[in-house]
Swiss-Prot record:
NCBIfam families registered for this protein in UniProt: rRNA maturation RNase YbeY
Keyword set includes Metal-binding: yes
Name of this chain's protein: Endoribonuclease YbeY
GO molecular function, one term: metalloendopeptidase activity
Single GO cellular component term: cytoplasm
Keywords tagged on the record: Cytoplasm, Endonuclease, Hydrolase, Metal-binding, Nuclease, Ribosome biogenesis, rRNA processing, Zinc
Entry keyword annotation includes Metal-binding: yes
Listed cofactors: Zn(2+)
């Protein structure tokens, strides 16, 4: 079973956010052909907390919109254990998501979905450190969002 564990450090999250992200990432999981027995976490934080995480773990002392930590990187495979595949953690700054939705002229729901999917693709190994990787990741991101029906309109 695909499991997403949600945590809210802001006190502002509602169940609709959880459901939207759960539906989108379940759709993306199928699009990416990820096995059903997988899990990840999504945590909502404020600007101060995401800046601290960004500083402490990425050496970037600034606010950002989403950070993901893939738990599979450099992990040895353990054979014979019937355990779910743990993909990692996605951390979303709800305040920045609201600001970016307004700045880009689309709904908060679309921005939230975009950030959750962006973090999810990072957990699967996609990146945008060079032009070719960026083209692949952003193309995949757009295709999944379009197929799901979460457009910029």
């Amino acid at each position: 079973m695909f499991t997403i564990d949600f945590t809210d450090h802001t006190g502002e999250v509602n169940s609709e956010w959880y459901q939207q992200i759960d539906n989108l990432l379940t759709f993306a999981k199928k699009e990416e052909k990820i096995e059903d027995d997988a899990e990840l976490s999504v945590t909502f934080v404020n600007k101060q907390e995401i800046q601290e995480i960004n500083r402490d773990y990425r050496n970037k002392d600034k606010v950002t919109d989403v950070i993901s930590f893939a738990l599979e990187e450099d992990e040895p495979d353990i054979e014979g254990l019937d355990m779910p595949r743990v993909l990692g953690d996605i951390i979303i700054c709800a305040d920045v998501a609201k600001e970016q939705a307004e700045e880009y002229g689309h709904s908060f729901e679309r921005e939230l979905g975009f950030l959750a999917l962006h973090g999810f693709l990072h957990l699967l190994g996609y990146d945008h450190m060079n032009e070719a990787d960026e083209k692949e990741m952003f193309g995949r991101q757009k295709l999944i969002l379009d197929n799901y029906g979460l457009t910029r309109d």
